A protein has these predicted regions:
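Hydrophobic transmembrane architecture of multi-pass small-molecule transporters
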Residues: 73-170
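C-terminal module of multi-pass small-molecule transporters
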Residues: 1-109, 169
Length: 170
């Protein structure tokens, strides 16, 4: 069991590295930019499972009648851990998206010439389709709101990956 410590440390380091790599994403990040980092996360998680299971079977080897209990508990922990982990990370992502969204929107005012220009350019994209200038302005505002939400989501996912890295390091 002492020799199993190193694979656990390596797997946690791989997961932390992959998470840190993904925590600097932007709206320009594409799937091909995530291949290496997601491989590190997936491989690290899989590599973590083997030594953990071997460490858990240590007590089963000394008392074989605990095999069924171990198998059931291991399965329950895997399923509940996956569900609870996904739920907690999803909740964290939503909370962080709301935070980032409020921070972004707080700085958007139509009195700012850059914001007004962005709204106008967003509305001008519909110039050939929508004749009403008020409706085009509304479409420009909606376009800006969509961009702000997208940026807030990217920042929130960056926060999620940084949280995963921190958990892996601890």
């Amino acid at each position: 069991p002492a020799h199993l410590l190193m694979p656990l440390v390596i797997s946690l380091a791989l997961m932390a590295t992959g998470s840190v790599m993904d925590s600097f994403s932007s709206n320009l990040t594409r799937p091909q930019n995530l291949y290496v980092s997601q491989f590190l996360l997936g491989f690290g998680g899989t590599f973590f499972l083997g030594p953990t299971m071997v460490l858990g079977t240590k007590n089963v080897l000394t008392n074989p009648r605990n095999l069924v209990s171990f198998s059931v508990m291991f399965g329950i922990c895997q399923n509940l851990g996956g569900l609870i982990g996904a739920a907690l990370l999803g909740t964290f992502q939503i909370v962080r998206e709301k935070f980032h969204s409020s921070m972004i929107v707080e700085h958007l005012t139509l009195l700012d010439p850059r914001v007004a220009a962005r709204v106008q350019s967003g509305g001008s994209a519909y110039g050939g389709i929508v004749a009403d200038p008020e409706l085009r302005n509304l479409m420009g505002i909606r376009s800006l709101a969509t961009a702000a939400t997208r940026e807030a989501n990217v920042m929130a996912y960056n926060d999620v990956f940084m949280l995963i890295a921190i958990i892996a390091i601890l």
